[in-house]
């Protein structure tokens, strides 16, 4: 694929993350297995992330495959990952199992696979009891600095070349 198509893909993915992070209602993800690259960014862009127990791979592999991490990716990672894991994840492309992914900040909870959907429904029911206006306003207030940074990062990525060294 061309650098232009890579830039378009990165931009669309970053804009999706921006929409998810600012979405007025809670976004709950039930992750039933691996979450690499954009899959991991989807986890980082959600409000509550439930994974399953097991030897699943979760993380940002961009540097490992020869892609210099884009500005928006760094902004998303900085806003959600534990500081201790940020460099390990972004700079070193370290991939985590489900349990490690909680400590890193990719997941909030892990459950046996047989309980994944039941747990997601319970979290959704809990979230449905939130006052919608208060939740949306609070989410935007908490995330404002990160959302502003992400918007600027997306603009910067549009002006930059995507660096992929295969």
Task: Please place each PLM-identified region on the residue numbering.
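Hydrophobic, secondary-structure "cap" segments at the distal end of domains
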Residues: 73-84
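Glycine-rich beta-to-alpha active-site loop
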Residues: 16-65
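Glycine- (often His-adjacent) and acidic-residue-rich active-site loop
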Residues: 1-16
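Well-ordered beta-strand positions
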Residues: 48, 88, 92-94, 109
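Hydrophobic/aromatic residues within transmembrane alpha-helices
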Residues: 42-44, 101, 120
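Acidic, divalent-metal-coordinating active-site segment for phosphoryl/phosphodiester hydrolysis
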Residues: 37, 93-100
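C-terminal long alpha-helix characteristic of the crotonase
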Residues: 51-52, 104-153
